[in-house]
Amino acid sequence: RLTVQDTNMGMNQSLIFAEGCENICICGGGELDGQGTRTNFPGDETCHGTPGRPFLMRIIDCRDVHVHDITLRSAACWMENYLNCDRVLLERVTVRNQTNYNNDGIDIDGCRDVIIRNCDVESGDDACCFKGASERNTERVLIENCRLYSCCNALKVGTDTQGDFRDVLVRNCQIGGVEHDPSGLKHRCSDSGVSLEMVDGGTLENFLIENITIDRA
């Protein structure tokens, strides 16, 4: 299997970056704007081909991360990436990320004890995505009372799936496709409401989705 270093080369440029930290709080009110429409950011389709295109937020190997009551807008690439973290809490976060290819909303990668609650996400790519770029498992995740809308997949596992995924509960959420893509890049509302793409050797266990509404997918 690949390592985190193999799969994340050139992706550490971000407006907010933390590695090996504890007790992080990013809270509002207020707004963080990644200015992803700026012409100085490369515009090719894939992140791997454009290492100069930053995330808005990338948090690696951190503990006790709390993001709440804030709006995150217009990243050049992914909006929020949490990699190999423990005890992550996202509450009342609004994400509007539809300016470029690869405009994911929330990416959870090898994290444990995660709560995503009362968040509102509209993204050009995956709205909320579970990834496994290393062999560290993603475990004990709760997503509830969220609105997740996307031009691609509203709720997704993969495609980086070297690690395993277990004990995930998604409930009381509204998910689907955005009404239109303001970037004009994809010319569609959505690929799917829920997409489970285990392609790299990881396993999916005890992944429960209940009481959700899907439209425009």
Question: What positions do the PLM features span?
Answer:
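Extracellular/periplasmic carbohydrate-active domains that bind, remodel
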Residues: 1-217
